[in-house]
Design a protein with these regions (language model features):
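Active-site rim recognition segments
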Residues: 11-111
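Short, well-structured beta-strand/strand-turn elements
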Residues: 1-10
Length: 112
């Protein structure tokens, strides 16, 4: 298994999120998200356990590993030592931790 993180991109409800992928011989990497538990829409066993062997399509992957070095390398300690969903900011005086800067992301949902 390995770690993945990024953003849940559900319409009107996007946020940072982490999940996993499990490798099955002959199938490949299968995403799982145990944090979603049993969905309220579940009407049968396949739907109840969907997130234990599947994942919805509302994900944007930022990381497929954790604790990796940044390029270019930072001079000061990182704000986030596990993943890199929001990015890192530093200046000649040191690291700027998350409360000292913000980000903005526009999301456009396309109809099929």
């Amino acid at each position: 298994a390995h770690f993945q993180s990024g953003f849940m991109m559900h319409p009107k409800a996007w946020n940072l999120h982490d999940w996993a992928e499990i490798y099955f011989e002959g199938i490949g990497w299968v995403p799982v998200d145990q944090s979603f538990g049993i969905p309220t829409f579940a009407r049968n066993a396949d739907e109840e356990y969907f997130f234990l062997g599947g994942i919805d399509s509302w994900r944007m992957i930022v990381n497929s590993d954790y604790g990796m070095p940044l390029i270019p390398e930072k001079k000061y300690p990182r704000s986030e030592t596990v993943d890199f969903q929001r990015g890192e900011v530093e200046w000649e005086g040191g690291n700027l931790y998350f409360p000292k800067w913000d980000y903005h992301m526009d999301i456009e949902y396309l109809d099929n």
